[in-house]
Amino acid sequence: MRYLLILLLTSVISALNQLSFSGGGSFGAVEIGILKRVMELENKKFDLYTGISAGALNAGFLSYYSDINKGIQNAESLYLSIKNRMIYDVLPLTGVSVLNSKPLEKTLTKMLSSMPNQPLVHTLIGATNLYSGKLDIYSFEDQDETNKVLLMMSSCAIPGIFPPIQFNNQLYADGGTLSNELIEVEHDNNYLNITFITPYEDYIYDNTAIKSLKDMLCRTAMIVMNNFNDPIASLNQNCKVPIGEMNKYYVPSDVLRGYNILNFDKGNELINIGYNNVVHKRYIIC
């Protein structure tokens, strides 16, 4: 499974400011903490949001706000209120996963129904098509309310942990199953400025005992999302005239030691970890 989406698109403007979120379950709260700090340092306005898994939830939520700082403030409140019981349950059994995501469907439906307007920022969300084996990318704002929820859930359906989701006559699982860091560059003589928010630096050494199938699936997801193919490392940076840049913001691995991507009861702690431990790396795109 891979939990990062960086999709670079052509633009008719001189510079495209894009905000991209990776995935990571409850670590989506870390991303909001990171973004809050980044915006305090440089208050940007973005033209495009992208996200996979938990990043899809963050991107979709923020797309409703013309003022991203107001969106961040409300996202903080949301993560402070979210508990495990609002995301998943063990019963009823699905037969294809250890957890049932019906509570997440209810939570997302309630969240979107409370929005005073439609999305205001173009937002792309990725999910893995279990029929074609491909990563499908959808425009969030083009979906009706029901399908907005299903699209978010499709991107968050970690195989084995959450059940796959029927959406658009297809069957979907977590977007990170195929692409943790998908970098597709289509350049049209415009400067690409990517702000990439992720909780991940490298894999966190973890010798915590594995006592259940849920623990095993969670550990496997963490290992794969941090180690399976790293397109960022292969970015072409040896050029005199770059076509853009990617600014990656993350937290050191050790600050997340002891935290679990399926534990949504620690939203306040995770937001603070993101806010107080931001690390920045800049990559040139050729």
Predicted regions and their residues:
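Sec-dependent signal peptide recognition
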Residues: 1-7
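Patatin-like phospholipase
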Residues: 7-52, 60-286
